[in-house]
Design a protein with these regions (language model features):
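Interfacial transmembrane-helix starts/ends
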Residues: 14, 83-99, 103-111, 128-131
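Interhelical loop/hinge segments that connect adjacent transmembrane helices in multipass membrane
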Residues: 1-31, 74, 78-85, 210-221
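Alpha-helical transmembrane segments of polytopic membrane transporters and translocases
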Residues: 18-19, 34-36, 48-64, 96
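Membrane-interface helix-loop junctions in multi-pass transport and translocation proteins
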Residues: 168-200, 207, 212
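Residue-level recognition of pore/gate-forming positions within transmembrane alpha-helices
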Residues: 28, 55-58, 138, 164-169, ...
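Helix-loop junctions and terminal segments of transmembrane helices
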Residues: 57-82, 150-153
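Interfacial segments at transmembrane-helix termini and the short loops linking adjacent helices
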Residues: 44, 84, 110-139, 185
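Membrane-interface junctions at transmembrane-helix termini in multi-pass inner-membrane proteins
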Residues: 135-165, 206
């Protein structure tokens, strides 16, 4: 019938895609593991407050998934032969994304009471005590997105996977020590520290690969 068989090395394919699968799986656990630990030390009311903050934070960073889906194919087309264009485009997106993260974090802080009342109602106004910490995490997630994408297109997905695995382990260990004393604040302090560590890993290896910080404002025209 004119069909041709194409040989596929299944083991090689699995080996290549495994880091992506692990990264997705760990990413799903990344923002939920602290809730599991919190359940052992705080009230159901506190859990509700924390989960409301997490849902709002995820909503504030939904644009990152869209950006990744658009940006990674575009940058991948430049990585082999047009490195200068890749650096220029990545720098533009990096600066714009970081500025976007700052703006969103500021809006969340300035209008926190109004947003909480509008979305969750009066019973959740206590969430405003923790908004500053959630907004820091929002900014950190925007800060790291371009560096993470650069590692993916540079065939460094294993580094991303090791990074999230390490920081997940960090969250679990530190949470067990700080949550019994600091409760919700402890979980948020740990999550902020984990994002700083992960962003540092991404930044270091992206800089090592391209020898630029992707902060050159001259590229934004």
């Amino acid at each position: 019938f004119g069909l041709k068989s194409i040989p596929v090395n299944l083991l090689a394919e699995l080996k290549q895609t495994f880091p992506y699968a692990v990264h997705i799986a760990v990413g799903a656990m990344y923002l939920n593991i602290d809730t599991i630990i919190l359940r052992e030390f705080v009230s159901n009311s506190d859990i509700g407050i924390y989960q409301a903050g997490m849902r709002a934070m995820v909503a504030a960073t939904l644009g990152l998934e869209i950006l990744n889906s658009v940006l990674i194919p575009k940058l991948s087309s430049l990585v082999a032969e047009k490195k200068d264009q890749l650096i220029k485009l990545s720098t533009k997106f990096n600066l714009l994304t970081i500025m976007g993260g700052i703006v969103i974090a500021l809006i969340v802080n300035i209008f926190s009471n109004q947003l909480i009342y509008l979305v969750y109602g009066e019973k959740f106004l206590r969430l405003s005590d923790y908004v500053i910490y959630f907004s820091i995490i929002i900014f950190l997630r925007y800060f790291g997105v371009i560096y993470g994408a650069l590692l993916t297109i540079s065939d460094k997905q294993k580094i991303r996977t090791y990074g999230v695995l390490f920081t997940l382990l960090f969250i679990i260990i530190v949470d067990l020590f700080v949550i019994p004393t600091y409760e919700l604040y402890g979980a948020l302090y740990t999550l902020i520290a984990a994002h700083i560590i992960l962003n540092t890993i991404y930044f270091y290896f992206a800089y090592k690969e391209y020898r630029t910080s992707f902060f050159n404002i001259a590229y934004v025209k």
